[in-house]
Amino acid sequence: MAWNTNLRWRLPLTCLLLQVAMVILFGVFVRYDFDADAHWWTERKHKNLSEVENEFYYRYPSFQDVHVMVFVGFGFLMTFLQRYGFSAVGFNFLLAAFGIQWALLMQGWFHFLEGRYIVVGVENLINADFCVASVCVAFGAVLGKVSPIQLLIMTFFQVTLFAVNEFILLNLLKVKDAGGSMTIHTFYAYFELTVTRILYRRNLEQSKERQSSAYQSDLFAMIGTLFLWMYWPSFNSAISYHGDSQHRAAINTYCSLAACVLTSVAVSSALHKKGKLDMVHIQNATLAGGVAVGTTAEMMLMPYGALIIGFICGIISTLGFVYLTPFLESRLHIQDTCGINNLHGIPGIIGGIVGAVTAASASLEVYGKEGLVHSFDFQDFKRDWTARTQGKFQIYGLLVTLAMALMGGIIVGLILRLPFWGQPSDENCFEDAVYWEMPEGNSTVYIPEDPTFKPSGPSVPSVPMVSPLPMASSVPLVP
């Protein structure tokens, strides 16, 4: 089918309306929190506080790292498609910029409402980045198959559902999930896989050539992987309690990521008949350990336990890219462009299960009395809880997350199927030239034009595409 991809009026109006709405809502609801307010100086003198006791100095280094992950790490990780680099980085930038504003509001209404105002400080910025990181994860499943308007609409609903699910897990079920294995990775992976199933494209084979990578595009994607890998310890520890919990979260993530690299490389080589490595596995499966250790990051997992998690996830994630992704596409019609099920979905579920087991097995011998109370917040509402009770509620949290993801994905997928969002035709997926002004000599694909907003009859055959980037297979080998 041919679609009208001319967004001259629709995209500007959508962006401007959303931003005007954000300005109005921020004006009505949002104010600085105490540590960011000018009145802090008065309180500082009254309580004899030091400047370094401001929350900013504790949290901002972690915020910087998470911010880099969202805009550089996830953005460049998706540049592996040979003709979709502009869109991968540019659309990631767009949806993240909108998402952090909407996340500050949605999370503020659930968690940071004081009277009639949402108070915003550096911890809010970290939580908003967490929310947007999950949106970037979800973007990977529909990469190359949706319009920027669809991405903005999807971000609006995703952030809303994320805030609701996060509130249920953290506030009602009292789940521990410092690194977001459940609230971030599991939720958005299966939310977006459900959306992808509903947006199934029967003739996507027509764009199969552009769905592959090139030597340069894989190199750019590897830059994204390295940024994510380096900063993931900050991601998993960013909102943990100061002191031992935050320290432990960084160590556990560090160990899990390291083990994951070795097993990913081992399995990738073992599955190739000549023992060669697949760059897709190295770009993605090497990060699965950081995803899976998220829930248990601040628990007394022990370094060897973190290594075991990374070891297992490196194997499972790589096997998923080789066997599970093709199965999902051919049998279940789930067209997962980036393989987010293997990097985020399955490792997220593993993380949720390991978190439940680790919580249920917590003991006074391992944590100490004060440490157990502090680590699991066994006070007030939870003062009569045992470690087994905590483990049971961790499982409830995982089940609620999966249910929310599936139901939300169905609803949002049906909305995105409407024909007036400017989505590309099947023969023009994974192509920057559909939505971007390309440098001279690079735009060689024919883009069908349809003056209506509805699908037309049989699609116009496209002119054969000439890629400006050499395919990996066509790069001459140096003897």
Swiss-Prot record:
Species per Swiss-Prot/TrEMBL record: Macaca mulatta
Keywords linked to the UniProt accession: Ammonia transport, Cell membrane, Glycoprotein, Membrane, Transmembrane, Transmembrane helix, Transport
One biological process term in Gene Ontology: ammonium transmembrane transport
InterPro entries: Ammonium/urea_transptr, NH4_transpt_AmtB-like_dom, RhesusRHD
GO cellular component annotations of the record: apical plasma membrane; basolateral plasma membrane; cytoplasmic vesicle; plasma membrane
PANTHER family cross-referenced by the UniProt entry: AMMONIUM TRANSPORTER, AMMONIUM TRANSPORTER RH TYPE C
Disulfide bonds: none
Glycosylation sites: 48
Protein name: Ammonium transporter Rh type C
